[in-house]
Amino acid sequence: MAPQTQSLVFKVRRNPQELVTPAKPTPKEFKLLSDIDDQTSLRSLTPLVTIYRNNPSMEGKDPVEIIREALSKTLVFYYPFAGRLRNGPNGKLMVDCTGEGVIFIEADADVTLDQFGIDLHPPFPCFDQLLYDVPGSDGILDSPLLLIQVTRLKCGGFIFAVRLNHAMCDAIGMSQFMKGLAEIARGEPKPFILPVWHRELLCARNPPKVTFIHNEYQKPPHDNNNNNFILQHSSFFFGPNELDAIRRLLPYHHSKSTTSDILTAFLWRCRTLALQPENPNHEFRLLYILNARYGRCSFNPPLPEGFYGNAFVSPAAISTGEKLCNNPLEYALELMKEAKSKGTEEYVHSVADLMVIKGRPSYFYNDVGYLEVSDLTKARFRDVDFGWGKAVYGGATQGYFSSILYVSYTNSKGVEGIMALTSLPTKAMERFEKELDDLFKTKDKSQILRSHI
């Protein structure tokens, strides 16, 4: 096993939080969000982190000051982020572009990156100190849309952590913002890709018309709530050897499937086996996020470069727990591929129309059988470079019971692969890990990275 960095404890000294406002006057106006943005399920706050080592060429330069100044300049281009969300007619969200600013926290930690362990991966110890939850800042409405904390480390590295209001953007959109911020931090006068609003492109049609059955929003037939579980948060690394072992479980005609498809089907089945559903007929749903910027869901003409709103849908694959556990891996893979095949431009429009017709239905996150998989590798958070080089880690801060998140990762041996972040009840996590161990049969358990809270 990888070192248990959760035993690491350190102190973080924070300066009082401040509001960083745009460096120049910006338009005072209201901007409507799209009907994809406006989903109930996206009215949430999402943390992300990028971590940087010391760079001798940047000696004498303060990442806090550089990023604070760059943030003010970046908000001139991304001025809606400096505003506040309000409820509009029929409860539809809109941005009041007030220019009030975003929360910024300067901090110092008495710890080095090496103390986090050889392989730097979530969940991170003391993360609540690296992204401080400012009292009164966690509202969806009438609150700052971004909270950013930059923490200097004793080794000369630093941690950039951000909490975003998910209704404003998805991972691709946030990556675009962070890269623009980093470009200005490196001395550029403006972001290489200028932001584009155009949320009307993902609004409901007039008249709205639902053209698909959207199982992802339908109430499960059996109630099985997950609220009583004590969760263990873990990370698992899948390099070429692990991914090849999974491919060998499939017949030849499926072996050429994408890495993401194969890994997702495998983890869906492993998770179901680990949960040991008592009711064999309990429904298990896999929602796989598809983005309208690329792939099957891409628009014609494409969404404009610079669009940073939410642009994804999540078609659902459905099976009983019994069938998912008793059938070979190809069964899960075929179900997932069938669900993904629905992901087209028309499907995106149908979701937007559904939000208007049905009053913003939500996902059923609290059901044991619900699982959403989000591939963040295309967001390329590790490429965000404030001048200290690329991040040694960039992406989500942890997985959740209802989701598995994929992050691009290079381990301490230089092997590139995918880090899968998830959370399960303790006993289920032990069974989940055993499923992986039994398949890979590796004596080097450090290849399967695990840490827990």
Curated annotation (Swiss-Prot):
Keyword Transport: no
Recorded catalytic activity of this chain's protein: 13-hydroxylupanine + (2E)-2-methylbut-2-enoyl-CoA = 13-(2-methylcrotonoyloxy)lupanine + CoA
Signal peptide: none
Transmembrane regions listed in the UniProt entry: none
Enzyme class per UniProt: transferase
Superkingdom in the source lineage: Eukaryota
Single annotated GO MF: 13-hydroxylupinine O-tigloyltransferase activity
InterPro entries according to UniProt: CAT-like_dom_sf, Plant_acyltransferase
Keywords, comma-separated and alphabetical: Acyltransferase, Transferase
Any Pfam family hit: Transferase
EC number: 2.3.1.93
Notes on how activity is controlled: Inhibited by N-ethylmaleimide, p-chloromercuribenzoic acid and diethylpyrocarbonate (DEPC).
A GO BP annotation: alkaloid biosynthetic process
Assembly behavior: Monomer.
Function: Acyl-CoA-dependent acyltransferase involved in the synthesis of lupanine alkaloids. Can use both (-)-13alpha-hydroxymultiflorine and (+)-13alpha-hydroxylupanine as substrates. Lower activity with (-)-3beta, 13alpha-dihydroxylupanine, but no activity with (+)-epilupinine and (-)-lupinine as substrates. Tigloyl-CoA, benzoyl-CoA and, more slowly, acetyl-CoA, propionyl-CoA and 2-butenoyl-CoA can act as acyl donors.
Sequence similarity: Belongs to the plant acyltransferase family.
Stated name of the protein: 13-hydroxylupanine O-tigloyltransferase
